[in-house]
């Protein structure tokens, strides 16, 4: 009876083109008869665990939205690239991607993008596009003292929490900087609208 069950299991496995000696990485052992219990089969219980591959795992919150990482830089900061093939170059951050901790720095890490033509008579184009850099590969840069520094946080007398450069003590989050950034964003929005 046990032999007949094993034969039917092997035939069903072969019809599914599965190996009859393993199931999800766990070996299948035939049901053995205990010498003490004549006629009653004993089964070995084993736990079958499927592991997700590293590239299949996605960090998500319970509501299935992506986890957003905190970054030490913001849009408008002047940074210096500290590693990679663009090492040593200085630029301003134009965009931030919080889900994968990457930033786009103006005129740095340019990649060529080939664009097909839309119409028959029109030729295709080769565009230069700024590619993202991981935020750990950039460091805040002081234009006045020409030095890179880590970022620190402190509370001013008026109760505002600001970021500053640890080496120089220069405050990054001043109101003038934010006003300049907002004006620049308005200008680019007006240019894009026209």
Swiss-Prot record:
Transmembrane segments annotated in the record for this chain: none
Classification via Gene3D superfamilies: 2.30.30.30
Compartments, record wording: Plastid, Chloroplast
Transit peptide: 1-50
A GO MF label: structural constituent of ribosome
GO cellular component: a single term: chloroplast
UniProt subunit comment: Part of the 50S ribosomal subunit.
Similarity comment text for this entry: Belongs to the universal ribosomal protein uL24 family.
PANTHER family: MITOCHONDRIAL RIBOSOMAL PROTEIN L24
Protein name per its UniProtKB record: Large ribosomal subunit protein uL24c
Organism expressing this protein natively: Pisum sativum (Garden pea)
């Amino acid at each position: 009876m046990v032999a007949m069950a094993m034969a039917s299991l092997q035939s069903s496995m072969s019809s599914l083109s599965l190996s009859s000696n393993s199931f999800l990485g766990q070996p299948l052992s035939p049901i053995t008869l205990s010498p003490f219990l004549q006629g009653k089969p004993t089964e070995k219980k084993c736990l079958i665990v499927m592991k997700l591959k590293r590239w299949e795992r996605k960090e998500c919150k319970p509501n299935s939205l992506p986890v957003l990482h905190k970054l030490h830089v913001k849009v408008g900061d002047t940074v210096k690239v500290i590693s990679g093939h663009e090492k040593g170059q200085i630029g301003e951050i134009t965009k931030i991607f919080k889900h994968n901790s990457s930033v786009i720095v103006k005129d740095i890490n340019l990649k060529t993008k080939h664009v097909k033509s839309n119409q028959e008579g029109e030729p295709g184009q080769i565009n230069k596009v700024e590619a993202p850099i991981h935020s750990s590969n950039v460091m805040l840069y002081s234009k006045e003292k020409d030095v890179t520094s880590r970022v620190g946080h402190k509370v001013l007398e008026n109760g505002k929490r600001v970021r500053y450069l640890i080496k120089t003590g220069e405050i990054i989050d001043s109101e003038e900087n934010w006003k300049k950034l907002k004006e620049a964003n308005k200008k680019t929005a007006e240019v894009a609208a026209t």
